Amino acid sequence: MKSVFTLSASLAISLMLCCTAQANDHKILGVIAMPRNETNDLALKLPVCRIVKRIQLSADHGDLQLSGASVYFKAARSASQSLNIPSEIKEGQTTDWININSDNDNKRCVSKITFSGHTVNSSDMATLKIIGDD
């Protein structure tokens, strides 16, 4: 009887942990090394097309300056959207959530995100981390 109770308790705890893990759907989509010179062709290609409703940007190493960003959706006509992003992100700073307006039912998936920008105030390359929320 004691083993049945222990087994039941273990299953209940693992179900709670499972559901807790699924409540937070934030995923690191990737990291981009930002060059020291202004570049407009920095791309994060997602190997698996993901439905992403919003993103956060984080400067993990070094300060960076951004001049633009676009999201490309997997669609027959290669739809894209320009994003309203902050022009500067300091090391250790994370932006607020940036909404991605996919179609009305949020079923379009993101195939790539492009950035224009560069590292500032450093001889090392800054790194830009992209976090997605689906």
Curated annotation (Swiss-Prot):
Keywords: Signal. Coiled coil: none annotated. InterPro entries: UPF0412_YaaI. Residues 1-23 form the signal peptide. It comes from the Bacteria. The keyword Signal applies. HAMAP family: UPF0412 (MF_01372). NCBIfam families: PRK10154.1. This is UPF0412 protein YaaI. It comes from Escherichia coli O17:K52:H18 (strain UMN026 / ExPEC). The gene is yaaI.
